[in-house]
């Protein structure tokens, strides 16, 4: 077999019959499969050993040669080669067809490639191939021209003779009639008898005339058909064709079926055809030109690729290896077989029957029928169901053809090539492991033993516990005591990977150091649950084992959970305390007035109390029970940095140094909390709400190395659990208190609601007004009950503690529990005007229960739909962006995009831009940021972190130019400087990082949180799409629902207000032609926008508009934006619109991820004029290829091509990728492969999918070419100390994670800069 590492591209083409015979190891002549008695393959059948190889290793069919020593011998009795049985997976056979057949992909595909090549309509082609019409293949024009006059004379003679014959017959009949009439008259017959007789005679004469006329017409038809006869002409009338052959057989040839197509192909001159088509394109117009363009695509493909079009008509059919279409015996003695065997058997049966009929010299009509059936059976084999009714097996199930084996989720590509199963893996239920450190996981002993079995066995032999591998295996299987010690030794510092499905982003797989645990459940660290989206209600996780030293190093450095604290989507920490831990820290840092031992100033009768000289003294007091953790006290601190304002007050300009004492007004709990933070971090004297905790961890991640952050969050977790236990926060029915004022509040609002009802019954309000009024009233009522609830609850109520600390839940839920549920929506998303007045504590009435479940069920159904839709969106995003990899350090471009940092308000102060987090943060500066005095605040090429942004704002800079992937000039992929900081590591992105996939995951992962439904904006008006459908609409570049027109030019508006429509005319400033927009529906409403004087009002007559400005409410069409304002604007428009949807749901994704996808949507250029290049007008070309080809042509002083940028939706862009492997594994597999084969496409294997499919290392991360040849070699010391067990003490964090002398890889943040 091929070694995948020795080729860099994969080409696909058309196989001719010659190729098929060369691949083949023999011809399959019989439809037999295996002998049902001996169960051995039949000779010359579909499983024949002579053709495909032996069924048993090193053993021929008849048994004459058995053993490996006869390797390579071909048995003279049975003709089987003695070799391995696995050759039955790779050896092909073939079937020699008695008549050629066309390949259904090229005939039936849309467009029909055969039809375009031969310039035949698909309908006509079908008639020819399936023997419903004859086609003329050649005409001897010269001979016909030379002998035309002779033939015409002959034809005239024949006509004359027909006419003469007719005249003579009529003459004779007329005379006979006269004579008979005379005789009748003589006999004295009556007049009506005579009349009848005459009518009969005239009828016969009429028939004679008609018969002669038909004969003359037929001759005329034959003659005119013959004189106009041309190649590719169809003749449907069988008799006409027979006559033509009889009379003029030497002047032309014709045939039906695939043979005729083959004949036409042989005479087809590709070069001449391409030239004539180019001529038509140059001079033609309209339909003719379009048709020529489409045909030229196919013709040029054959011309350039050197493919022979004969490959579309087959003389032989390949038979795939038998192991790929196996036949297995079931328990009952029956056989289960692959559908392909049935399809092959039909082909062979029909082929053999056809051979026999031809040998017997059967009549044409029978032979043709058999040929048609052969064609249909080959069609069914290649693509069952593409034409006519599919061939069905037992139970009316359509058989799976070769195409079906490739297609869809269960096809070869997605099931077996992109979704392989792996060994060294296991799965089990997860339980929480609060005692673990962040980089550890608990692995069940039995599972670990099975996973590490080979390692344990080798180590047992090394330590002489076992003599050989076999006995070591036996020891492991019997679980002898020594085995556990060895296992403990083997797993030390050998990381494992944990994965939870669905893996929506890269943090769904992380590496951990395993710790052996009893039981059968995997223990998971509580802080990584957020990243895995795991909970402990029965979730399962899979464990994988990295084997090689390189894999272990990558797992440890790149994937260890303590190195993956930040979210790749937003760059903010994901591993932070949640739920109980938040509650615990919140409890710990709460200050309670007048608690035990609180500070009391001195009075006459007592000295000052509640003052402590050190935290230790305060802790002793707490241990004695005279001080509460939450009491306000004064304490002297020496080892903690004071907050900035206190530092300035106590220590002035010199600042605080470790050891300097200062006194804090705080609580013991807060002092204990601050001891968890790293040295030098300013004292935090606040109550720890979840948001405050998040801000602290975020700050730590910006300022300290990852290892410190990991240690800190671990300490916070331990403290959180410890104090949550001691806080006594539990929930019971007694904690749910119904506010006593609830009844009187509701009575008051009931009265108001009754008034509205009466007005409605009197007719003073219509239905909609009544509903709106009731909704308003009940919203107010709900708010007031909520407020009463707030006032009624004590501060230390556990439910309030849980909600206020940010641990979980919100006030709405508390209100539903204890106050009232309030208004609920119906499935359309409208409020039902009757509220649910009861709370869950009191219980709901039947009606309330019903309307409440209504909404809840809608929610569940929505979630299920959303998950599927969001998954599909992620798949399309990954596909379109999978080859965006960081390819170089800097593309040296001068271009960039301008981002706003702040808005200057009239009084001169700056207001920080709301979305600075996702736009400017973590970017590389594209130009020096200079203040008004000309000082450079931040230099070009610097990374914009939080401190830099603060400095820019302090200097009064409102906008900066930053580098962006939208303006990156790297050919394939992007450069590190344009991409900027990697959100997951907080450093400049490494070369080789697969930023495309990270972008797709960052956008797709929160997809399930987006809403499904389209919401109404302002009651009436068109539906404005929102949520997931809107994101899809944008990424697929569809024309939006409720499309709003945009101004094509800058100028003044003339607004005409009609009855149902507006008409807007823009008079351009430059005096050009006026632009008119009419039939603008009034339901859509005019756009509100800011005017020069700062006021906001609706667009009105005489307003001034800028180019690209939206004129109506709704969404602009991105294709219009591209046409009017160009590619840069449409990119920014798409990024902004996508962000709007995510921000509405409170999801933070950095702009750069969306930019990566948008860049891929605008990669192509459509050719308008091909100049001197090879491009065809109207074709889509990659921008990089377009520019390089133009440079080449200009250098050779030719005419460059002209192109226009195109916006493609992500599905279309994925299918238009250069890699046919990637496109085929995405969607429309047969269409992609058909096209690729005709064009003889070559896949350069640049993306990730292609490499996964053929089993190479992906060209990303450490698999990138520049790192390919780095070898890892352990040093002697490392070898010597490979197995020393680290002691798992409590303080497991040492500078390099573990106090062992073992070969631990230090977990500092590796800077890869020196490898550049």
Curated annotation (Swiss-Prot):
The protein's matches in SUPFAM superfamilies, at most eight in alphabetical order, are given as: beta and beta-prime subunits of DNA dependent RNA-polymerase (SSF64484)
Q: Which residues bind Mg(2+)?
A: 535, 537, 539
Q: What is the lineage of its organism?
A: Bacteria, Bacillati, Actinomycetota, Actinomycetes, Mycobacteriales
Q: Which residues bind Zn(2+) 1?
A: 60, 62, 75, 78
Matching PANTHER family = DNA-DIRECTED RNA POLYMERASE, DNA-DIRECTED RNA POLYMERASE SUBUNIT BETA
The name of this protein is DNA-directed RNA polymerase subunit beta'
The protein's gene is named rpoC
GO terms for biological process, alphabetical: DNA-templated transcription
Q: Which GO terms describe its cellular component?
A: DNA-directed RNA polymerase complex
What top-level class of enzyme does the UniProt entry assign? transferase
Subunit structure of this entry? The RNAP catalytic core consists of 2 alpha, 1 beta, 1 beta' and 1 omega subunit. When a sigma factor is associated with the core the holoenzyme is formed, which can initiate transcription.
């Amino acid at each position: 077999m091929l070694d995948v590492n020795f080729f860099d591209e994969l080409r696909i083409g058309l196989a001719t019959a010659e190729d098929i015979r060369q691949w083949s190891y023999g011809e399959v002549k019989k439809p037999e499969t295996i002998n049902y008695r001996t169960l051995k393959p039949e000779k010359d059948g579909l499983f024949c050993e002579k053709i495909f190889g032996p069924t048993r290793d090193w053993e021929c069919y008849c048994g004459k040669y058995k053993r490996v020593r006869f390797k390579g011998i071909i048995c003279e009795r049975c003709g089987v080669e003695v070799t391995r049985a696995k050759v039955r997976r790779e050896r092909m056979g073939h079937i020699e067809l008695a008549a050629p057949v066309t390949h259904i992909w090229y005939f039936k595909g849309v467009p029909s490639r055969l039809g375009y090549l031969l310039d035949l309509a698909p309908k006509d082609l079908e008639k020819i191939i399936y023997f419903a019409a004859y086609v003329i293949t050649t005409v001897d024009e010269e001979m016909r021209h030379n002998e035309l006059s002779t033939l015409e004379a002959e034809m005239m003679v024949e006509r004359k003779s027909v006419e003469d014959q007719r005249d003579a017959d009529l003459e004779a009949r007329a005379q006979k009639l006269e004579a008979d009439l005379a005789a009748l008259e003589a006999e004295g017959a009556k007049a009506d008898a005579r009349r009848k007789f005459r009518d009969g005679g005239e009828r016969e004469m009429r028939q004679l005339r008609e018969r002669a006329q038909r004969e003359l017409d037929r001759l005329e038809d034959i003659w005119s058909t013959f004189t106009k006869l041309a190649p590719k002409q169809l003749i449907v009338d069988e008799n006409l064709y027979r006559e033509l052959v009889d009379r003029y057989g030497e002047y032309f040839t014709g045939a039906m079926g695939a043979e005729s197509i083959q004949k036409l192909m042989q005479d087809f001159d590709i070069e001449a055809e391409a030239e004539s088509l180019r001529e038509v394109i140059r001079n033609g117009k309209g339909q003719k030109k379009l048709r020529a363009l489409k045909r030229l695509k196919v013709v040029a493909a054959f011309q350039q690729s050197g493919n022979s079009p004969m490959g579309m008509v087959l003389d032989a059919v390949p038979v795939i290896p038998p192991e790929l279409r196996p036949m297995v015996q079931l328990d009952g003695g029956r056989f289960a077989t692959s559908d392909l065997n049935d399809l092959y058997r039909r082909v062979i049966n029909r082929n053999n029957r056809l051979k026999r009929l031809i040998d017997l010299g059967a009549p044409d009509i029978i032979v043709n029928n058999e040929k048609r059936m052969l064609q249909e059976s080959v069609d069914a084999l290649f693509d069952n169901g593409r034409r006519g009714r599919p061939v069905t097996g037992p139970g009316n199930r359509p058989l799976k053809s070769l195409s079906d084996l490739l297609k869809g989720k269960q096809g070869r590509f997605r099931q077996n090539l992109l979704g392989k199963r792996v060994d060294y893996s296991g799965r089990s239920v997860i339980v929480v492991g609060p005692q673990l450190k962040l980089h550890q996981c608990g692995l069940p002993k039995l599972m670990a033993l099975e996973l590490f079995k080979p390692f344990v066995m080798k180590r047992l032999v090394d330590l002489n516990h076992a003599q050989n591998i076999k006995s070591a295996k036996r020891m492991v299987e019997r679980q002898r005591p020594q085995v556990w010690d060895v296992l403990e030794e083997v797993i030390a510092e050998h990381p494992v990977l944990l994965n939870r499905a669905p893996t929506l982003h890269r943090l769904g797989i992380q590496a951990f150091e395993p710790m052996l645990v009893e039981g059968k459940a995997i223990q998971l660290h509580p802080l990584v649950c957020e990243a895995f989206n795991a909970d402990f209600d029965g979730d399962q996780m899979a464990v994988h084992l990295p084997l090689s030293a390189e894999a272990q190093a990558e797992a440890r450095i790149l994937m260890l959970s303590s190195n993956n604290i930040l979210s790749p989507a937003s760059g903010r920490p994901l591993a932070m305390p949640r739920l109980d831990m938040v509650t615990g820290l919140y409890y710990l840092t709460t200050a309670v007035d007048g608690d035990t031992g609180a500070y009391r100033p001195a009075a006459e009768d007592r000295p000052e109390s509640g003052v402590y000289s050190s935290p230790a003294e305060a802790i002793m007091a707490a241990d004695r029970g005279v001080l509460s953790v939450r009491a306000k006290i004064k304490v002297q601190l020496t080892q903690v940095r004071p907050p900035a304002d206190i530092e300035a007050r106590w220590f002035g300009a010199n600042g605080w140094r470790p050891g300097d004492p200062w006194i804090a007004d705080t609580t013991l709990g807060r002092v204990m909390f601050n001891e968890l933070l790293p040295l030098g971090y300013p004292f935090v004297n606040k109550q720890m709400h979840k948001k405050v905790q998040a801000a602290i961890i975020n700050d730590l991640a910006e300022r300290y190395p990852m290892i410190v952050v990991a240690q800190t969050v671990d300490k916070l977790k331990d403290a959180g659990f410890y104090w949550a236990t001691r806080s006594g926060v539990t929930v019971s029915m007694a904690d749910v208190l119904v506010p006593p004022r609830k009844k009187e509040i509701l009575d008051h609002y009931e009265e108001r609601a009754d008034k509205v009802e009466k007005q409605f019954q009197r007719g003073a309000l219509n239905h909609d007004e009544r509903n709106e009024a009731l909704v308003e009233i009940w919203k107010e009522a709900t708010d007031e009950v909520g407020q009463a609830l707030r006032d009624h609850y004590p501060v230390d109520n556990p439910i309030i503690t849980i909600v206020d600390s940010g641990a979980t839940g919100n006030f709405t839920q508390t209100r539903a529990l204890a106050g009232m549920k309030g208004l609920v929506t119906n499935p359309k998303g409208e409020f039902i005007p009757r509220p649910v007045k009861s709370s869950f504590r009191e219980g709901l009435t039947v009606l309330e229960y019903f309307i409440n479940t209504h909404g809840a069920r809608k929610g569940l159904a929505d979630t299920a739909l959303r998950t599927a839709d969001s998954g599909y969106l992620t798949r399309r995003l990954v596909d379109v962006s999978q080859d965006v990899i960081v390819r170089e350090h800097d593309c040296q471009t001068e271009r960039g995009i301008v981002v706003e940092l702040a808005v200057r308000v009239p009084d001169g102060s700056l207001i920080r831009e709301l979305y600075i987090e996702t736009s400017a943060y973590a970017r590389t500066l594209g130009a020096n940021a200079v203040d008004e005095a000309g000082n450079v605040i931040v230099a070009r090429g610097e990374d914009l972190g939080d401190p830099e942004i603060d400095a820019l704002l302090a200097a009064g800079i409102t906008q900066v130019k930053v580098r962006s992937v939208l303006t990156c000039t790297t050919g394939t992929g992007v450069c590190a400087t344009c991409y900027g900081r990697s959100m997951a590591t907080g450093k400049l992105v490494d070369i080789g990082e697969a930023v495309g996939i990270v972008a797709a995951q960052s956008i797709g992962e929160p997809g399930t949180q987006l809403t499904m439904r389209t919401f109404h904006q302002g009651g009436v008006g068109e539906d404005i799409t929102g949520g997931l459908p809107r994101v899809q609409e944008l990424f697929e570049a569809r024309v939006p629902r409720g499309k709003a027109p945009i101004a094509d030019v800058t100028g003044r508006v003339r607004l005409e207000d009609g009855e149902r429509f507006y008409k807007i005319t823009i008079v351009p400033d430059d005096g050009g032609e006026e632009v008119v927009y009419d039939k603008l529906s009034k339901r859509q409403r005019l756009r509100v926008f800011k005017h020069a004087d700062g006021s906001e009002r609706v667009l009105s007559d005489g307003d001034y508009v800028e180019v690209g400005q939206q004129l109506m409410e709704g969404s602009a069409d991105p294709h219009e934006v591209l046409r009017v304002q160009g590619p840069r604007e449409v990119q920014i428009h798409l990024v902004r619109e996508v962000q709007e949807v995510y921000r509405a749901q409170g999801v933070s994704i950095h702009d750069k991820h969306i930019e990566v996808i948008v860049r891929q949507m605008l990669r192509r250029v459509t050719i308008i004029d091909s100049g001197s290049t090879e491009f065809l007008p109207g074709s889509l070309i990659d921008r990089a290829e377009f520019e390089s080809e133009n440079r080449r042509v200009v250098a050779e002083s030719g005419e460059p091509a002209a192109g226009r940028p195109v916006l493609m939706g992500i599905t279309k862009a994925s299918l238009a990728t250069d890699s046919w492997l990637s496109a085929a594994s995405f969607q429309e597999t047969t269409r992609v492969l058909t096209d690729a084969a005709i064009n003889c496409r070559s896949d350069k294997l640049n993306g990730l999918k292609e490499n996964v499919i053929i089993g190479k290392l992906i060209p990303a991360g450490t698999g990138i070419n520049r790192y390919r040849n780095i070898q890892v070699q352990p040093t002697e010391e490392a070898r010597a100390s490979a197995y020393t067990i680290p002691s798992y003490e409590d303080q497991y964090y040492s500078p390099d994670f573990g106090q062992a002398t073992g070969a631990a890889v230090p977990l500092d943040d590796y800077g890869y800069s020196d490898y550049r």
